[in-house]
Each structure stands twice: as structure tokens, then as C-alpha cells.
């Protein structure tokens, strides 16, 4: 099911992190453009979501903005509208996947596990999780 979310037509660079339409060297930008195959579960003008290739839960989907921005902090400063669109997409995907609950995670920086420097929200569900996360 595709859901169109309100978009922000022109988003200025806030000067925090790298931001451009797409980055030809970025793995996620290549997935957005269809240059690299992925199991895409959701797409609209602001967001593309696809299954993680090394899932950490029965449902593990990566939700990425369709503009290249390095991390969650930069995305939030650049566009609260697109940031909200990622969370709205997470809710729609969870509903489609039949999840009664889910965890959403942004890793911001290499020291906490960010390995692709294109902001992305992890949607994890289908099993129990502990707190604090390990």
C-alpha cells in the first residue's frame, strides 16, 4: 500500500551535514534510483523503505529519505516534514506487516553503528526486545 504524504517542495541546505538531491557514491541513493536491487516495501515522494539485507528481527525495514542527508540530526534540521514522513511511513509499514508493536531506531555516527551515511530509520518488529538495548 502506498500512502502519499505532504511534501516540502524546496528544502534549503541548513549547513549541518551533507545534503544534496542524491549522492552517486551512496548505497542508499543507488537503491532509491533503482541502480541496486532491494526488496522495496514502501515508496512515496519523500521516503523509500526496503528490507534490511541482514535483518535483526523478523521484520527489519530501513526507511530512508529520498534526498541524501548524512544522519538523523542533519535530516531533522533540514526538514522536519521529511523527518515526520519517515515515522509516518513506519506506522504504515508496521500496519501492513501486521505488527502490534515495533521499535524504531536511528544510529547517528560510526561509534554507535551507523555504517551507511545516508539517514535511515530502522523499523524492527516481530519479536520481543529488551531495554536497555545492547
Predicted regions and their residues:
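HIT superfamily nucleotide-processing domains
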Residues: 4-6, 10-134
